[in-house]
Curated annotation (Swiss-Prot):
Native species: Felis catus
Name of the molecule in the record: Malate dehydrogenase, mitochondrial
Gene name tied to this protein: MDH2
Modification type N6-acetyllysine: residues: K78, K91, K165, K185, K215, K239, K296, K301, K307, K314, K324, K328, K329, K335
Regulation: Enzyme activity is enhanced by acetylation.
Reactions mediated catalytically: (S)-malate + NAD(+) = oxaloacetate + NADH + H(+)
In-chain residues carrying the UniProt-annotated modification N6-succinyllysine: K78, K91, K185, K203, K215, K239, K269, K296, K301, K307, K314, K324, K328, K335
Length: 338
């Protein structure tokens, strides 16, 4: 089962399950008892790249930690429960992954989650700024288009802001794009790579199918349809789960893939590239997802948008107003915090 999980999308994920991989990454998962947090913690526990795994939530973490601790892999697991234990969970961490928050229900957009998740992310990232200011911060909590600006503003307030270490995890958009294009063209999804830029909600998700490797040719009707499916794939899962949650397993997989790529880069591996929603100067939007070359200190180089088609140019132009509004909403939230 786990070998099948390890197979697709991303050499980093495959390597993380190999016994030859050696590392001592200390990783914390905040929101570890939730629908994404539990399978994400399982994937992290299963990787030899991780030597210490600390799990935090406001309920059930001792049980999740006890369960995971019985797995015969090298990562030492410890659970932390409630705000008073959060500092100990974070001390010494190299990477912090935050999937905490409420999931979407049918009829909700990612933006509908803002009121609840904004304060959760602000609280957790404030603790990160205080107790592990040098760690890489990976935000999964939606709406990512707003929670990344929130994280940045919180770190600025604490005087420890480093834009090269704060990542909005958009990897699921890439995973979905790879899968859907592979299905459409009869390809092995493990060998397909579609960069996805922009943001992480609806029309701000911009798959660059013109840059797909291997190169694929699609008629405009298929291109429009598959682009729409990639943009609304999260809603597809929310509807299919019929009120029982949102994408959890695929999101955990994508989150683990991003963390393993980051750890590979921290270890000095060269040529590690992932897309992520970060502080950016690629457009007139202050945050934007593009392919990033990762390194020991986080973002080594923003690889930018590259050559794109007129269809993709149009999508960027249409996405920017919504993206700017979501970013401003996040920034204003922190400014108005007491």
């Amino acid at each position: 089962m786990l070998s099948a999980l390890a197979r697709p999308a991303g050499a980093a994920l495959r390597r993380s399950f190999s016994t030859s991989a050696q590392n001592n990454a200390k990783v914390a998962v905040l929101g570890a008892s939730g629908g994404i947090g539990q399978p994400l913690s399982l994937l992290l526990k299963n990787s030899p790249l991780v030597s210490r795994l600390t799990l935090y939530d406001i309920a059930h973490t001792p049980g999740v930690a006890a369960d995971l601790s019985h797995i015969e892999t090298r990562a030492a697991v410890k659970g932390y429960l409630g705000p008073e234990q959060l500092p100990d969970c974070l001390k010494g961490c190299d990477v912090v992954v935050i999937p905490a928050g409420v999931p979407r229900k049918p009829g909700m957009t990612r933006d509908d989650l803002f009121n609840t998740n904004a304060s959760i992310v602000a609280t957790l990232t404030a603790a990160c700024a205080q107790h592990c200011p040098e760690a890489m911060i990976c935000i999964i909590s939606n709406p990512v288009n707003s929670t990344i600006p929130i994280t940045a503003e919180v770190f600025k307030k604490h005087g420890v802001y480093n834009p090269n270490k704060i990542f909005g995890v958009t990897t699921l958009d890439i995973v979905r794009a790879n899968t859907f294009i592979a299905e459409l063209k009869g390809l092995d999804p493990a060998r397909v790579n579609v960069p996805v830029i922009g943001g992480h909600a609806g029309k701000t998700i911009i798959p660059l199918i013109s840059q797909c490797t291997p190169k694929v040719d699609l008629p405009q009707d298929q291109l429009t349809a598959v682009t729409g499916r990639i943009q609304e794939a999260g809603t597809e899962v929310v509807k299919a789960k019929a009120g029982a949650g949102s994408a959890t397993l695929s999101m955990a997989y994508a989150g683990a893939r991003f963390v393993f790529s980051l750890v590979d880069a921290i270890n000095g591996k060269e040529g590690v590239v992932e897309c992520s929603f970060v502080k950016s100067q690629e457009t007139d939007c202050p945050y934007f997802s593009t392919p990033l070359l990762l390194g020991k200190k986080g973002i080594e180089k923003n690889l930018g948008i590259g050559k794109i088609s007129p269809f993709e140019e149009k999508m960027i132009a249409e996405a920017l107003p919504e993206l700017k509004a979501s970013i401003k909403k996040g920034e204003e939230f922190v400014k108005n915090m007491k």
